[in-house]
Design a protein with these regions (language model features):
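Conserved hydrophobic beta-strands of the Rossmann-like cofactor-binding core
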Residues: 6-9, 83-84
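The beta1-alpha1 cofactor-binding region of Rossmann-like NAD(H)/NADP(H)-dependent oxidoreductases
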Residues: 58-70
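NAD(P)H cofactor-binding loop motif with strongest signal on the N-terminal glycine-rich segment
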Residues: 8, 12, 160
């Protein structure tokens, strides 16, 4: 199919990433579904039965620059039309019991560092590393998932590290 596009979706095994993957596959496109934990891909395995030719599950730890480079090497000959940087974290779970670690006065800098590593530095490294494959694609798009929680006007969630990393 000449208008079949190739997508790279991070955090593809659950949440928004899984839904993006489903919607893209429904459009008869190819998805490289990147996820950190290859053992936690039950829903992707179900999808792969229906979309055998179009769904390729690949390992990626967005926090690990070597993992990003390894994936780039693995997909070296793939012209990527659209990369969706979706992988992210809100911080330690259980979320509501741990938001104080993101508050001024009780900041846990390791939490902030982990959140920024996943939500900011990882996606920037993805963009830098996959730029050439995206330039080879037809659409040439990079999409970065933000959040309304990143809005200064809407600070009711109190996940300040997450909000700052998603602004």
């Amino acid at each position: 199919m000449s208008d079949q596009k190739k997508y790279l979706v991070t955090g593809a095994n659950r949440g928004l990433g899984l839904e993006f993957t489903k919607q893209i596959l429904n459009g008869n496109h190819i998805v490289y579904a990147a996820c950190r934990n290859i053992d936690d891909i039950d829903e992707l395995q179900l999808l792969s039965k229906k979309y055998q030719e179009n769904l390729i599950v690949v390992k990626l730890d967005i926090n690990n620059h070597d993992s990003i480079v390894d994936l780039n090497d693995h997909l070296e000959d793939v012209a990527i039309d659209v990369m969706i940087n979706n992988a992210g974290t809100i911080g330690p779970l259980p979320y509501f019991e741990n938001t104080y670690k993101q508050h001024f006065g009780t900041i846990d800098y390791d939490v902030w560092s982990d959140v920024f590593k996943t939500n900011l530095f990882g996606p920037v490294k993805m963009a830098e590393t996959f730029l050439e494959q995206i330039k080879k694609g037809h659409d040439k798009k990079m999409i970065f998932i933000s959040s309304v929680v990143g809005s200064i006007a809407d600070d009711h969630q109190k996940a300040f590290a997450y909000a700052t990393s998603k602004t």
